[in-house]
Amino acid sequence: LDEMKISASTVNDLINFEMQLHIDLCNEYGISKTDLESTDEQNENIAYTRYVLELGYSGDFLDLLSALAPCVLGYGEIGLNLKDFKPDNVMYQKWIETYASNEYQDVCKNVSQLIDNSFLIRLGNNYKDTYKWVQANKIFNKATLLEVDFWNMALK
């Protein structure tokens, strides 16, 4: 039940707060919600999202957590690293403040705790010595590379 509560809370935060942040930022720069919704999906986005979805369909909960973690935790890490950076152009300041915020950092802590507890519950105290842990790390690393490609779309 605890896993379901944390998962539901995280999904709620992502859909109702994080997505709205991105919609609002785009709107500030002249990109409407309609424009966003009608934009053709790029290959990098397809590769990343389908990888995560496929693991959700064919893998187990640990696989899915391993694939989702780079996104949730990566944004938090980037936000923290940029927290004290004051760009000349404030275009991304709201984004930085959101992902560096205590609220988003709490989301990251909750997700990290969910991951640790989920492995512990399913695989025991020595879960880091299991084949499943090795596989989870491979999934995490692959998802991280796909996340990097996703970010690099902006540079095209």
Write out the residue ranges for each language-model feature:
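Structural helix-adjacent loops and short alpha-helical linkers that scaffold large soluble proteins
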Residues: L1-M4, T130
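Acidic, carboxylate-rich catalytic segments that either coordinate divalent cations
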Residues: T130, V134-K156
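Short loop-to-alpha-helix "cap/lid" segments that border enzyme active sites
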Residues: C108-L123
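Short, charged/polar, low-complexity loop and linker segments
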Residues: V52-E54, I121-T130
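Active-site-proximal alpha-helical scaffolds that flank and shape metal-associated catalytic sites
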Residues: K5-V107, L145
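Hydrophobic residues within well-ordered, non-membrane alpha-helices that form the packing/core
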Residues: C26, G76, I115-F119, W151
